[in-house]
């Protein structure tokens, strides 16, 4: 299927970035935690447990009275939601005919009971679903959200719930003088890449370590004289002091070399790290001897291959701090 452009935005709810399904009113047939698993749903015919066919998703019992079923997800990356996907893969005679999505923004770590008592904002009104399908719904909201609530009408099964968007970090929870300028969770974003054949370049700047090769960025094998690259708009204008290029899990397919370039406008580039030899399955750390202000970063790998993570440690400039803080404030009132 042709996927909407906004599905290229990271999944703010994914377990891989720290999301959690904190509550569901019912999960008799299949556990709520399946909703945010990062991998694609699977189906194994004739795999029955003591409650029936085992599904890789969230499935509630058949309702015999009016009502709806709900699940609340705490976003691993609070941010502006651009769209959601309600994936009913492999649910055919037992998918919900309708779904709706709401959101709320709250500080701290409220309990499910406290969350349920809040006033929620509708992101997706009650909308029809198709069975065994990805059901995408674009969202028009400029606010920063911390939790979303999926309602299914009246009951049934959903394989995955994807909440795509742009992370917006809370400056009150960060040391803006020393943090990862290229981190997705801090608001950095991929603006371009030469190739994403095996996996998304968003993985490069995702939280935590990659646990397997598939959690990094890997390109197809090149058969020409070129090289692959990724460009990133940083969390804000800053001065980097240390770069980390991590090839963990990439053994026979790590790049041979890499370089870093910086820019203040995304068009005019200067050298940050010269072309440097890399080793397979290794976290490389490079102090930057002549740090300069930059707002964009370009990673070039030679000629192709896979990288697990890219980190760029440093501090925001005065202008970077101002823009970083204003982005958060604007999304709070959006």
Regions from the language model: what does each represent?
Residues 50-54, 110-137, 203-222, 269-288:
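Intrinsic, low-complexity N-terminal interaction/targeting segments
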Residues 94-107, 253-265:
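Short, surface-exposed beta-strand/strand-loop-strand elements in extracellular ectodomains
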Residues 1-70, 74, 166-235, 251-253, ...:
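Disordered, acidic Ser/Thr/Pro-rich linker "stalks" and the adjacent N-terminal cap
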Residues 79-90, 150, 239-249, 299:
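A short beta-strand element within beta-rich, extracytoplasmic domains
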Residues 152, 220, 249-252, 258-334:
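C-terminal functional regions that serve as terminal interaction/effector modules
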Residues 158-169, 312:
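Short, structured interface segments
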Residues 78, 120-157, 227, 238, ...:
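Beta-sandwich interaction modules
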Residues 87, 102-106, 164, 246, ...:
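Predominantly extracellular/luminal cell-surface or secreted proteins
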């Amino acid at each position: 299927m042709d996927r909407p452009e906004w599905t290229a935005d990271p999944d703010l709810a994914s377990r891989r970035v720290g999301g959690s399904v904190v509550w569901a009113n019912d999960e008799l047939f299949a556990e709520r935690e399946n909703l945010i698993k990062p991998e694609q749903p699977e189906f194994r015919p004739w795999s029955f447990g003591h409650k029936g066919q085992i599904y890789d998703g969230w499935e509630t019992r058949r309702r015999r009275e009016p009502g709806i079923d709900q699940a609340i997800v705490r976003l691993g990356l609070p941010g502006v939601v651009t769209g959601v996907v309600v994936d009913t893969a492999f649910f055919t005679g037992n998918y919900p005919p309708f779904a709706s999505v709401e959101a709320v923004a709250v500080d701290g770590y409220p309990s499910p009971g406290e969350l349920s008592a809040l006033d929620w904002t509708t992101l997706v009104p009650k909308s029809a679903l198709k069975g065994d399908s990805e059901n995408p719904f674009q969202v028009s909201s400029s606010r920063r959200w911390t939790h979303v609530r999926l309602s299914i009408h009246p009951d049934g099964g959903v394989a995955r719930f994807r909440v795509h968007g742009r992370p917006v970090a809370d400056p009150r929870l960060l040391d803006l003088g020393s943090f990862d300028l290229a981190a997705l969770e801090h608001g950095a974003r991929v603006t371009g890449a030469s190739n994403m054949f095996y996996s998304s370049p968003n993985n490069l700047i995702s939280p935590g370590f990659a646990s397997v090769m598939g959690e990094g960025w890997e390109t197809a094998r090149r058969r020409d004289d070129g090289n692959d690259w990724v460009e990133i708009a940083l969390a804000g204008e800053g001065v980097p002091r240390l770069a980390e290029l991590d090839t963990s899990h990439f053994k026979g397919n790590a790049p041979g070399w890499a370089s870093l370039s910086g820019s203040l406008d995304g068009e005019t580039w200067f050298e940050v790290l010269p072309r440097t030899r890399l080793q397979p399955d290794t976290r490389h750390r490079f102090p930057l001897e002549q740090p300069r202000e930059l707002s964009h970063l370009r990673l070039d790998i030679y000629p192709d291959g896979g990288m697990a993570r890219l980190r760029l440690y440093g501090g925001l400039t005065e202008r970077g701090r101002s823009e970083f803080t204003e982005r958060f404030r604007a999304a709070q009132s959006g």
